Regions:
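General secondary-structure edge motif
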Residues: 11, 23-24, 48, 52, ...
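Short, charged/polar micro-motifs that form catalytic or ligand-binding hotspots
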Residues: 34, 58, 118, 122
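Short, low-complexity N-terminal intrinsically disordered segments enriched in polar/charged residues
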Residues: 1-37, 41-42, 46
Length: 158
């Protein structure tokens, strides 16, 4: 039994695909970090193309980088979220030239400030469906949709 040695161009294409997938994973990690940095609009805005769309079930749809950063600025200004932890996992990323799609599972824990009482703890379970576009070697979000499947309070045990 003999196995064919892949050509250099085949190996280069395979390597490029892996590099693209890793770049998109890093993009998603920066998105989660920006959300967990009190929804920092400057950090988050840099991850989206000018004509991108951000949408989440139960929240709304924001078209264009300015609208997206405006939403995150408004959310930050409420002071409602004390801290959060966005965990995006189990990615399925498909690359096609300078575009790609991604599907991620989401587990988010956050602490909400409550005006008349102790902070409350919540969890969100859901998923993301995303489209990415590479321009001048850099991957950014073209669209991000988050579907919340469950949003519930939880209690810490003493």
């Amino acid at each position: 039994m003999t196995t064919a040695t892949p050509s250099v161009s085949t190996l280069e294409a395979r390597l490029q695909r892996l590099e693209d997938i890793e770049s998109i994973r890093q993009l998603k990690a920066r998105y989660c970090a920006g959300c967990d940095a009190d929804h920092d609009p400057a950090l988050l805005g840099a991850l989206f193309h000018d004509d991108a769309v951000w949408e989440a079930s139960g929240i709304g749809r924001f078209a264009g980088r300015d609208a997206i950063t405006g939403y995150f600025s408004a959310l930050r200004a409420t002071g409602r979220i004390r801290n959060s932890e966005h965990c995006a996992m189990n990615p399925i990323i498909d690359i096609s030239g300078d575009t790609a799609t991604g599907h991620w599972r989401l587990l988010m824990l956050y602490t909400a400030n409550v005006p008349d009482g102790a902070p409350q703890f919540f969890r969100i379970i859901g998923w993301y469906r995303e489209q990415y576009r590479r321009v001048e070697g850099e991957w950014r979000f073209q669209s991000l949709f988050c579907q919340v499947e469950e949003h519930a309070a939880y209690r810490l045990q003493d």
